[in-house]
Amino acid sequence: MQFLSQKLLSRVIVIMAMSCSTLLFAAEVGESALDLSLPLIVNQAQNAETVSLSDHQGKIIYLDFWASWCPPCLVSMPIMNEMRNRLQSQGLPFEVIAVNVDSDVEDGMDFLLDKPVDFIVLTDPQGETPARYKIKGMPTSFLISAAGVIEMKHEGFKQSDAAMIEKEILRLSELSQ
């Protein structure tokens, strides 16, 4: 009986330790963004096969987790593409990095063939990065300052959200100058 109690206790301790370690690496507002390195699904301007968040250090990043089966995700993509292009043309150090989480990469690619974007789109069909970022639903986005700090977490997307996101990007741009 004592052996079973010790075995059970050791399992509980291991499970608790694993839970705590996951929480230590969760992405929260006010903390440094977790780096990622994922394969490209599409990007005309990139020649690399994988892209890391750290490759864009010094830029404000809109990190967006999306899936082809998510209606709000599909609404956000062209809006964020237009915003990215407009802000970059004004000289803002801003980039959108989207992470597609479809288990079948072809689903994300099909959407992008139909509605191409100019920003970086990565793929994570195993869902490891969304798990590290504690994503609960789609879309979920993070606004990351030029210093690499998560300034905002946003769940869902409505067309009216774009103005609020842009206002926050402009605020971060002013702070980083």
Residue ranges: model-predicted function:
Residues 2-13:
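Bacterial N-terminal signal peptides that target proteins for export
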Residues 3, 18, 22-39, 177:
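N-proximal helix/coil linker or "cap" segments that precede and/or mark the start of modular domains
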Residues 37-61:
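A short beta-strand-turn-helix
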Residues 59-61, 65-69, 137:
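Short pre-active-site segment immediately N-terminal to redox-active cysteine/selenocysteine motifs
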Residues 65-82:
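Conserved redox-active cysteine motifs that mediate thiol-disulfide chemistry
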Residues 92-105, 119-126:
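Thiol-based oxidoreductase modules, predominantly thioredoxin-like and allied folds used
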Residues 109-146:
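Short, internal strand/loop/helix patches
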Residues 145-177:
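Thiol-/selenol-based redox modules, centered on thioredoxin-like
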